[in-house]
Amino acid sequence: MVKLAAKCILAGDPAVGKTALVQMFRSDGTHFQKNYTLTTGVDLVVKTVPVLDTNDSVELFIFDSAGKELFSEMLDKLWENPNVLCLVYDVTNEQSFISCTKWLEKVRSQTSGISLPGVLVGTKTDLAGRQTVDSAQAQVWALSQGLEFFETSVKEMDNYEAPFHCLAKQFYQLYREKVDIFHTLV
């Protein structure tokens, strides 16, 4: 049984639902807070995620940071050498989707040229009548950036775990590839 540890950056504009998503995931769906205050610094959420079809797991260290601090020195330090990325936008806020390009560039600038597995998550799908970001367009963009695509409603407890299970699986697959390469060298 292998237990890996991965640094996960949670990025996106303010008020897109990053904190709600990660808090729901941390509590296994038992905690949905109706009123959130904007994150002003960084919260660290740690949760062990089993890797499907194995006896192994990945402990995700999820850095939930304030969305308004796009170019702060604090983020530069905290975001050094991430292992996986969870990029979040609000399906009812087109600007939050457009901003994903800037967030992705910011996070990738911290990776020293290595491939960074990740997911793009559209939140607040329970507000479908107000949706301004086309799901197909978001999925095409995500795939063009090498990201898996998910939509979720934390309020409705819909699909909030899937992005994190995907991140754990992506990180685990990178680990397995490195182990396989190592075995070919020995």
UniProtKB/Swiss-Prot annotation:
The keyword GTP-binding applies. GO terms for molecular function: GTP binding; GTPase activity. Disruption phenotype: Null mutants retain the ability to ciliate and survive through gestation. They die shortly after birth due to different phenotypes reminiscent of Shh signaling defects: polydactyly, lung isomerisms, and structural heart defects. Conditional knockout in male germ cells results in infertility, abnormal sperm morphology, significantly reduced sperm count and sperm mobility. Mutant mice with germline deletion of IFT27 die shortly after birth with structural defects in most organs including the kidneys, where duplicated collecting duct system and/or duplex kidney is often observed. GO terms for cellular component: centrosome; cilium; cytoplasm; intraciliary transport particle B; nucleus; sperm flagellum; sperm midpiece; sperm principal piece. SUPFAM superfamilies: P-loop containing nucleoside triphosphate hydrolases. GTP binds at residues 12-19, 64-68, 123-126. Expressed predominantly in the testis (at protein level). Co-localizes with RABL2/RABL2A in the midpiece of elongated spermatids within the testis (at protein level). One of its GO terms (biological process) is cochlea development. InterPro entries: P-loop_NTPase, Rab_GTPases_membrane_traffic, Small_GTP-bd, Small_GTPase. Keywords: Cell projection, Cilium, Cytoplasm, Differentiation, Flagellum, GTP-binding, Nucleotide-binding, Protein transport, Spermatogenesis, Transport. It is found in: Cell projection, Cilium; Cytoplasm; Cell projection, Cilium, Flagellum. Small GTPase-like component of the intraflagellar transport (IFT) complex B that promotes the exit of the BBSome complex from cilia via its interaction with ARL6. Not involved in entry of the BBSome complex into cilium. Prevents aggregation of GTP-free ARL6. Required for hedgehog signaling. Forms a subcomplex within the IFT complex B with IFT25. Its role in intraflagellar transport is mainly seen in tissues rich in ciliated cells such as kidney and testis. Essential for male fertility, spermiogenesis and sperm flagella formation. Plays a role in the early development of the kidney. Component of the IFT complex B, at least composed of IFT20, IFT22, IFT25, IFT27, IFT46, IFT52, TRAF3IP1/IFT54, IFT57, IFT74, IFT80, IFT81, and IFT88. Interacts with IFT25. Interacts with IFT70B. Interacts with RABL2/RABL2A; binding is equal in the presence of GTP or GDP. Interacts with IFT88. Interacts with ARL6; recognizes and binds with the GTP-free form of ARL6. Belongs to the small GTPase superfamily. Rab family. This is Intraflagellar transport protein 27 homolog. It comes from Mus musculus. The gene is Ift27.
